[in-house]
Swiss-Prot record:
It comes from Lawsonia intracellularis (strain PHE/MN1-00). InterPro entries: HCP/CODH (IPR004137), Hydroxylam_reduct (IPR010048), Prismane-like_a/b-sand (IPR016099), Prismane-like_sf (IPR011254), Prismane_a-bundle (IPR016100). Gene3D superfamilies: 1.20.1270.20, 3.40.50.2030. Its cofactor is [4Fe-4S] cluster; hybrid [4Fe-2O-2S] cluster. Binds 1 [4Fe-4S] cluster. Hybrid [4Fe-2O-2S] cluster binds at residues 239, 263, 307, 393, 421, 446, 480, 482. PANTHER family: HYDROXYLAMINE REDUCTASE. Catalyzes the reduction of hydroxylamine to form NH(3) and H(2)O. Its EC number is 1.7.99.1. Signal peptide: none annotated. This is Hydroxylamine reductase.
């Protein structure tokens, strides 16, 4: 085992015995084997595409398979083995469609066993540390992009060109069936692929936003209660709004109340979801606090995506859906939540109403574009001096209190936009108002970075200037691979001066880091006081 794809990797180097996330050496190895199988599949898919052969089901499978290798998504070795076997079957399907002769003497499961004996891991990328670093940036970016592409596809939104790039990225640096390999491309070539990944991720997030809006309505500013309501209860964590919608439909009229958790908070801002009266509030904070929070919740919990941690203390109350999995946890297939609902009826629920603070969410792209005249007038008049986007992933590693302190110390003449689970460091803070604008504006989930970028771009166009000329600064926290893909999107869009923390990715080589500093002005966070002063110059 040698895994360094997340921010909390051991000693800021790599996990070698067991993952900080909880994955075993066996699961880590299976994930490496799955990536290997997907790279082989990618070559077959590209060859088929060259002949005009596209199989949408295999495209969807590919992003689904990449998604399960993200941090804190799926820890079930049986599930990963089935994906490896299906990747082999899909590769042979492409070969047959191209008219190639297939050796069927080896069954897919036997090929899986053969792959299991192969050495895999980080050292397989490239012997040159810089090329190795760029290849890792590309792979982790592809994983994040695939997560968003998966969510978009579930809502009926996809783009053949997006899948084609994912195949191209997977195939890069890996030998095709004739043994040809393009690993020896230059670092500049690798970085070009990395930036193209950022552009592809922008497209994936665009598709997802379109799917969410068409399915659930345009997000609007909405009050959300942090209190509890007497009665049976189900907690929904993750990011998949369709899973939440399906559960709301199936629990309507049952007397069971639904609470959001983690990055499900912005769901309350979507009109079609908010219309369900038994979607009563939000419970808990970010993913790393789930052991304490879930153990106190008097009902079952549904994990629709990452981040799931070892639920051993309450495993009988945990259910998963979609790509998420943990050994021994009940999985809800095909949108059927009957067993989850049965468990909710068995558990006590909340015994009484508990009033809680109310906060605002649902400030999507359209809300801020509608407020653009107010924002621009405030900037021109000097009332609004600066806009900070403070968002990204939260985590357990020390140093993340920086973000709550940053927001608390942001001057009264500034506005803080936020998104992702990083907001839970300060989401319940009352920062007051600037005129008619709240000083703390929750734009949504991590994928709503697309909306934030569109808003900033629109402001720049109105002011006839570049994005980097605006009084806007990005202060980001990262943890897993979706954050990597978003960072690549920002780089591809030419956004400069990003502050990143709490630590820099261990897979980024010193030379590439210097390139990012030189070309994009990326810098590690220091202290809130120093960074605020510098960014407001």
């Amino acid at each position: 085992m040698k895994c360094n794809q997340c921010e909390q990797t051991a000693a800021n180097d790599s996990c070698t015995n067991i993952g900080v996330c909880g994955k075993t050496d066996n699961v880590s190895h299976l994930q490496d084997v799955l990536i290997y199988a997907l790279r082989r599949l990618a070559h077959a898919a590209l060859s088929a595409r060259a002949k005009g052969i596209i199989v949408p089901e295999i495209d969807f499978f590919t992003v689904q398979a990449l998604f399960i290798t993200l941090t804190n998504v799926n820890f079930d070795p049986n599930v990963i083995e089935r994906f490896i076997e299906q990747a082999i079957i899909n590769r042979k399907t492409f070969a047959q469609l191209r008219g190639c002769k297939i050796d069927n003497s080896t069954r897919p499961i036997e090929e899986v066993k053969s792959m299991m004996s192969m050495p895999t891991g980080i050292d397989d990328f490239h012997k040159d540390k810089n090329n190795c670093s760029a290849m890792q940036m590309l792979l982790y970016g592809l994983k994040g992009t695939s997560a968003y592409a998966y969510h978009a596809a579930v809502l009926g939104k996809d783009d053949p060109n997006l899948y084609e790039f994912i195949y191209e990225g997977l195939a890069a640096g890996f030998p095709d069936r004739e043994g040809n390999i393009d690993k020896e491309r230059t670092l500049s070539d690798w970085m070009d692929l990395v930036l193209r990944c950022g552009k592809s991720n922008l497209r994936a997030m665009e598709l997802l936003e379109s799917g969410n809006v068409e399915s659930f309505g345009v997000p609007t500013s909405t009050k959300v209660s942090l209190g509890q309501k007497k009665g049976k209860a189900i907690l929904v964590s993750g990011h998949d709004l369709k899973d939440l919608y399906d559960l709301l439909c199936q629990t309507e009229g049952t007397g069971i109340n639904i609470y959001t958790h983690g990055e499900m908070l912005p769901a309350h801002g979507y009109p079609k979801l908010h219309a369900f009266t038994h979607l009563v509030g939000h419970y808990g904070t970010a993913w790393q606090n789930q052991h304490k929070e879930i153990s106190l919740f008097p009902g079952p919990v549904l994990f629709t995506t990452n981040c799931i941690q070892n639920p051993k203390e309450y495993i009988e109350n945990v259910f998963t859906s979609g790509v998420t999995g943990w050994p021994g946890v009940q999985h809800c297939k095909d949108g059927d939540y009957s067993k989850l609902i049965e468990r909710a009826k068995e558990l006590p629920g909340f015994s009484e109403d508990v009033p809680g603070k109310e906060l605002l969410t649902g400030f999507g792209k359209q809300s801020l574009l509608d407020a653009a005249p107010v924002i621009l007038d405030s900037i021109k008049s000097g009332v609004l001096q600066h806009i900070f986007l403070v968002g990204g992933c939260d985590g357990a590693k020390p140093g993340r209190n920086y973000y709550s302190e940053f927001v608390e110390k942001a001057p009264d003449n500034t506005v803080v936009l936020t998104l992702g689970c990083g907001k839970f460091r300060f989401f319940d803070k009352d920062l007051g108002m600037i005129g008619s604008l709240p000083r703390l504006i929750d734009m949504g989930q991590c994928n709503d970075a697309y909306a934030a970028l569109q808003v900033v771009t629109a402001l720049a166009e109105i002011l006839d200037c570049g994005v980097n000329d605006l009084p806007v600064s990005l202060v980001l926290s990262w943890y897993e691979q979706k954050a990597v893909s978003i960072l690549l999107t920002l780089l591809a869009a030419g956004v400069k001066g990003i502050r990143l923390g709490p630590s820099l990715p261990s897979f980024v080589s010193e030379d590439i880091l210097q390139l990012l500093v030189k070309e994009w002005g990326i810098a590690p966070i220091t202290t809130p006081d120093k960074d605020i002063a510098l960014l407001m110059q």
